[in-house]
UniProtKB/Swiss-Prot annotation:
S-adenosyl-L-methionine binds at Y126, H128, V131, A158, Q200, A241, S272, T273. Residues 772-783 have a biased composition (Basic and acidic residues). Residues 805-854 are annotated as: 10 X 5 AA tandem repeats of VDVTD. One of its GO terms (biological process) is methylation. Residues 409-799 are annotated as: Type III-specific C-terminal domain. This is Methyltransferase/ribosomally synthesized type III borosin cyclic peptide precursor aboMAa. The type III borosins are defined by the overall architecture of AboMA and are distinguished by their additional 400-amino-acid C-terminal domain followed by long and highly repetitive core sequences. Within the homodimer, the clasp domain wraps around the adjacent subunit to position the core peptide into the other subunit's active site for iterative intermolecular methylation. In the N-terminal section; belongs to the precorrin methyltransferase family. One of its GO terms (molecular function) is methyltransferase activity. It is an enzyme of class 2 (transferase). The active site is at R100, Y104, Y126. It comes from Anomoporia bombycina. AboMA automethylates at Val-805, Val-807, Thr-808, Val-810, Val-812, Thr-813, Val-815, Val-817, Thr-818, Val-820, Val-822, Thr-823, Val-825, Val-827 and Thr-828, Val-830, Val-832 and T-833 before being processed by a prolyloligopeptidase which likely forms a peptidyl ester upon removal of the follower propeptide, which then undergoes macrocyclization with the N-terminus of the modified core peptide. Pathway: Secondary metabolite biosynthesis.
Length: 861
């Protein structure tokens, strides 16, 4: 243990005549950790009763199969028993006149015996479990040699208490720490210009144990050595840390010669520690200072320049004392009231989910062990994490974790935009919160407070700026599947997913995205070359768009598979079907930016298939949509009443008198490898009124029949899920447009009679209506996938590519793609945001002069 805070912590004097045991043969090699069941963790309880336990130590005690302890007070014993009833006191292995080394061997062995049985074992040693302790180091070394996982956790040592109670910093001007017997036995060097701490001064040269204490017969040998270096009048601080809450700390000043007084000598016990302050300070080495660039050549150090403040307590008369408020200190204090945090300062800005997760990982050993085995599982199953936070947890990078938790408002704003692009609920909430503050002159502050409550410590203005920046420089804004027209024909589906671009289901190599322009080249092994200019089309310019106009992300530009680049722009891509119903790619898997087909599009008879309780698919009744005025839907002999249609999704409820509930998504399928049956198809869920909604799709239908209903359902579910992503994107876009309008309105709200206010209010009202329309689409989509987790884009398949088909009847005369300016394409913006250089931690560089060389290898508790 770390200190002589109790009478059990005494050194075992070495027997210089002891038999020398040869080292084990070179063939002896430790086994890799963790090959065997069982785990050993040694923790420290600190010196002060209970209060100096670390949170990690307590958690390990609570979760252990077996606990063994040597502690300094009965209150700590009681605390350990309260945390784990399977606890054993190792103090019982001490005995009068029994060699302490025998005791330490036995202490280690009882822990190892339980470890070898496969148990999770925790050893608790008072103070720091690795400082002046033998059993802990012995047990860990043997456990590792035998192939078990074994580690030590630090504790609060007696020296830590001494530094705090006496008020010294070991780095100024350096500190030597010795065990008193070892100092004498090996004639250790003393440096009177540094602090000196001597442990176990009350049992010098003694190797056995005495319950009633020791006769310190060798004490004068220590005083002789100290007097040789420091002189008889140098101060010695007799220190004993307080243990129980009712205890008081002993800090008594004596001189070396006063310690020879028999009355004072009796006050020194086995738990006593000595502190000797510096006798004089070492002068600055001017040559080294010049080499380090800390002093110009030819300059001299002024008298008093090295005077420390706070002063060293009880230092000798040759140690100068500085002053609290000199010129430099007064100048620094004068600047305090005008201080503004610098741009590089990043306070804690993390989601509540991230903060809770990191706290749990730091204080719950079992949770951390589970995370270590599968970081992605925790990252993907924890709700409320932002995308960067999830990535940081998946990688386990200390640098990434720091960067996502200590961020700027601009960084957090980008995280919010990324989150609401994928979470329509968050986007809807933001829309409503913004609109509620339209006429409030303090609206920015109110919205900022709301954002902070959601885990995003940023402002709507920063979010607005982030949205504009991400439209130009981040593919996250455009994440979806796009149907394309190339040279008047249906082109390949282009998918943007998790920062990766796909042509059909082929990954695009070495693409670049900058200033809203996406480029790639066939010279890099791609099946084509392209220069595509992206834009998010909105109607926030104050001019209403024609009915059924496309609103959402699209791109225009150049796409070619061979030869030279086309002379004029030849490509249009949209998140959804084109007005005529033509298109390509995923066969109709669009987004909120298209209005969806009329019910008449889906008139036909569909052979249906349903999932059985055994998990297989079986054919069921025919679903028919009649070509009558009402477009009646029947299922076998049953008529469906009061159904609704939105964005190619039909739904009905048993509460309206239907035999079951259903939500189904329709699409026009073009043959692919995954789904070779052509024509209208649907996929969705059906369930009885008495049953909960199924967790996954369980119903599919198509014109004709299929030998693989499971494959058909899976392919259609993928298309439906990509449509969901498109709908979510539409909600996010409308939320951003509304936020921009509200910011303008808040700025004009100071004068509600002005034309600027009226125009801003009208724009905000219109943006709110547009947002509500997008949210209505999303509500239907939410119903379709009720009880399912939001789609994980890392797992979601890429829709199969379809062959080029002629859609020359598609009317695109109103689409102007001839003036696409791609001359300013910047492909120099190579993304190196994921280069992790933050893992270098230099905040805890230890420049103290602590001498730990040749610590007495037989010194023990």
């Amino acid at each position: 243990m770390s200190s002589p805070a109790v009478e059990t912590k005494v050194p075992a004097s070495p027997d210089v005549t002891a038999e020398v045991i040869p080292a084990p043969p070179s063939s002896h090699r430790p086994l890799p950790f963790g090959l065997r069941p069982g785990k050993l963790v040694i923790v420290g309880s600190g010196i002060g009763s209970i209060g100096q336990f670390t949170l990690s130590a307590v958690a390990h005690i609570e979760q252990a199969d077996r606990v063994f302890f040597v502690v300094a007070d009965p209150a700590t014993e009681a605390f350990i028993y309260s945390k784990n009833k399977n606890s054993v006191d190792l103090y019982k292995f001490y005995d009068d006149k029994k060699p302490r080394m025998d005791t330490y061997i036995q202490m280690a062995e009882v822990m190892l015996r339980e470890l070898r049985k496969g148990y999770s074992v925790v050893g608790v040693i008072y103070g720091h479990p690795g400082v002046f302790v033998t059993p802990s180091h012995r047990a860990i070394s043997i456990a590792r040699d035998e192939g078990y996982s074994a580690k030590m956790l630090p504790g609060v040592s007696a020296e830590d208490n001494l530094f705090a109670d006496i008020g010294i910093d070991p780095s100024r001007p350096g500190c030597l720490t010795y065990e008193a017997t070892d100092l004498l036995l090996r004639n250790r060097t003393l440096v009177p210009s540094s602090h000196l701490v001597l442990f176990q001064v009350g049992c010098i040269g003694l190797s056995d144990f005495r319950f009633k204490g020791f006769d310190n017969i060798n004490f004068d040998v220590l005083l002789d050595r100290l007097e040789q270096v420091y002189g008889p009048d140098h101060a010695v601080i007799h220190y004993m840390a307080a243990v129980l809450p009712q205890s008081t700390t002993t800090i008594d000043r004596y001189t070396i010669k006063e310690l020879r007084d028999p009355v004072i000598k009796k006050r020194i016990t086995a738990i006593s520690t000595f502190y000797l302050p510096p006798k004089a300070l070492s002068p600055l080495h001017e040559e080294s200072a010049a080499k380090l660039g800390l002093m110009k050549a030819g300059y001299k150090i002024l008298d008093g320049a090295q005077a420390p403040y706070p002063p060293f307590p009880w230092a000798g008369p040759n140690v100068p004392i500085g002053i609290a408020y000199g010129r430099r200190e007064l100048a620094a204090v004068a600047k305090l009231d005008s201080h503004v945090p610098p741009a590089n300062y990043k306070p804690l800005r993390a989601s509540n989910a991230m903060k809770s997760t990191m706290i749990k990982l730091a204080t719950d050993p079992k949770a951390f062990a589970q995370y270590s085995r599968n970081p992605a599982l925790l990252a993907n199953s924890t709700p409320g994490l932002t995308t960067p936070e999830r990535k940081a947890l998946q990688t386990g990078s200390q640098g990434l974790v720091r960067s996502v938790m200590k961020t700027s408002p601009e960084d957090v704003a980008k995280q919010f935009v990324q989150a609401e692009l994928r979470d329509p609920t968050l986007a809807k909430q933001y829309s409503q919160e913004c609109y509620d503050q339209t006429g409030n002159t303090d609206g920015i502050a109110v919205i900022s407070a709301w954002l902070k409550s959601k885990g995003y410590d940023t402002t709507p203005t920063a979010i607005n700026d982030a949205w504009a920046d991400m439209q130009a420089n981040s593919l996250d804004v455009y994440q979806s599947t796009y149907n394309t027209m190339v040279d008047g024909k249906s082109g390949p589906a282009i998918t943007i997913k998790s920062g990766v671009v796909y042509i059909g289901n082929t990954v695009v190599k070495k693409f670049a995205f900058s200033k809203s322009v996406l480029t790639w080249s066939s010279t890099d092994g791609n099946p084509s070359s392209a220069t595509l200019s992206f834009v998010v089309l909105t109607d926030d310019d104050g001019q209403p768009l024609p009915a059924n106009s496309y609103i959402g992300p699209q791109f225009t530009g150049f796409y070619w598979t061979s030869g030279a680049k086309p002379a004029a722009a030849n490509t249009l891509g949209r998140n959804g079907a084109f007005p005529s119903g033509g298109g390509g790619g995923s066969g109709g898997g669009g987004g909120s930016s298209s209005q969806g087909a009329d019910i008449s599009t889906w008139v036909d008879s569909y052979q249906t298939y349903v999932v059985t309780t055994a998990g297989s698919w079986k054919d069921e009744d025919i679903l028919k949509i009649d070509d009558d005025t009402a477009h009646t839907i029947t299922y076998g002999p049953l008529k469906i009443v009061k159904y609704s249609l939105s964005n190619d999704t039909v739904s009905w409820s048993a509460t309206d008198g239907n035999p079951f509930n259903a939500v189904i998504f329709f699409k026009v399928n073009k043959p692919t490898k995954a789904n070779p049956t052509a024509g209208n198809q649907f996929v969705g869920k059906k369930w009885l009124p008495s049953d909960p909604a199924p967790a996954a799709v369980n119903w599919t239908g198509l014109i004709g029949s299929t030998a693989d209903p499971k494959g058909t359902a899976a392919a259609n579910a993928t298309a439906s899920m990509w449509k969901s992503i498109g709908i979510n994107l539409g909600v996010a876009v409308s939320a951003m447009v509304l936020g921009t309008a509200v910011i303008k309105a808040i700025g004009a709200a100071w004068d509600k009679g002005s034309a600027a206010w009226k125009a801003a209010k009208a724009a905000a009202d219109k943006a709110k209506k547009d947002a509500e329309a997008a949210e209505k689409d999303s509500a239907v989509d939410d119903e379709k996938f009720a009880d399912e987790e939001p789609p994980d884009l890392e797992e979601l398949p890429i829709p199969d590519a379809d062959p080029l088909v002629d859609v020359t009847d598609v009317d695109v005369t109103d689409v102007d793609v001839t003036d696409v300016d791609v001359t300013d394409v910047d492909v120099t913006d190579v993304d190196v945001t994921d280069v992790d250089v933050t893992d270098v931690d230099v905040t805890d560089v230890d420049v103290t002069d602590v001498d730990v060389v040749d610590v007495l290898d037989v010194v023990v508790i």
